[in-house]
Amino acid sequence: MSLSNKLTLDKLDVKGKRVVMRVDFNVPMKNNQITNNQRIKAAVPSIKFCLDNGAKSVVLMSHLGRPDGVPMPDKYSLEPVAVELKSLLGKDVLFLKDCVGPEVEKACANPAAGSVILLENLRFHVEEEGKGKDASGNKVKAEPAKIEAFRASLSKLGDVYVNDAFGTAHRAHSSMVGVNLPQKAGGFLMKKELNYFAKALESPERPFLAILGGAKVADKIQLINNMLDKVNEMIIGGGMAFTFLKVLNNMEIGTSLFDEEGAKIVKDLMSKAEKNGVKITLPVDFVTADKFDENAKTGQATVASGIPAGWMGLDCGPESSKKYAEAVTRAKQIVWNGPVGVFEWEAFAQGTKALMDEVVKATSRGCITIIGGGDTATCCAKWNTEDKVSHVSTGGGASLELLEGKVLPGVDALSNI
């Protein structure tokens, strides 16, 4: 989708206005303590811009976890986020115990100039997602009239709307698409994400390499299919490589992942690659394990030797890493989505680590390197490479859907310019 024609915060006049801003404060928590504040830090530039440019108030709304429309303040309250945000901004943050209704509307109607207000978890109301569960765990759907009322209440909390929650941009939830204000702008985090992906997908530097890992082919079919129209080269690694190798080389894969559904379209994908002149690199050797366990016995295998019965491939081997490194060396732009081994376990992390080192090297020579969120972003955090690549996406699902060529509802809902 073209992202260049949407209103962004830098073009929005906020002076004297109440800004209602959707952010992504869905942070990991342990015993009500925030374990990683990256998402809160990522929203600070947009909040500060509004305050520095004379906004009357900034009202922040977010979800946290999956309470499914049931208020669970003990488990999923955003109150700890207000404390963290106060220390990051160096100013008071007023926390409200709900996100809609007369009391919230009153608190946000005429606040002191320069106020920052954080609302309670949007997903304590089933009207945010449109569906959820009741207190006994039965599935429930929100009533259309109540969804309308929920959206109308959110719309009363500001004069202008800013969406900086890229991580939720693929969800057509009330706070993402249902706030009815004349001006709806993308915040700076949203803008950074969309700019990177727009550049990557609409006018890429070439040669353009996609590195696609992860487990199931079926989950990545749309991704592979869409990227085959855009890239010059593609590495297909991780668990899904075994489905390709079994179909194409009749390789013995032991008990490695095999995706019956995905297997049916491997040949179609390969013929599309050939038609488009895309060079595909698959792994040629593997680190194997006698069971899916961190402390499993390990072995080696190649495509030619096959993987023995009862064993499975959990990482690529050194020859594969060499081939991957050659592809990285040729590239001027790289998009990476999905690890190439079970990186969480030391014995099977080497392939992904070696590839990360190559991608970092490529970045330092001027290659544009984009890490699609999720597991690959976790790899960056694990090996401390977040500032050694061009861009690490904050949205796993959202970045995946952009790379699949889908329209993101949260972006679509912003004002056109």
UniProtKB/Swiss-Prot annotation:
One of its GO terms (molecular function) is metal ion binding. The modification N6-acetyllysine is found at residues 11, 48, 75, 86, 91, 97, 131, 146, 199, 267, 291, 361. The modification N6-(2-hydroxyisobutyryl)lysine is found at residues 97, 216, 220, 323. Its EC number is 2.7.11.1, 2.7.2.3. Phosphorylated at Ser-203 by MAPK1/ERK2 under hypoxic conditions, which promotes its mitochondrial targeting. One of its GO terms (biological process) is negative regulation of acetyl-CoA biosynthetic process from pyruvate. Belongs to the phosphoglycerate kinase family. This is Phosphoglycerate kinase 1. The gene is PGK1.
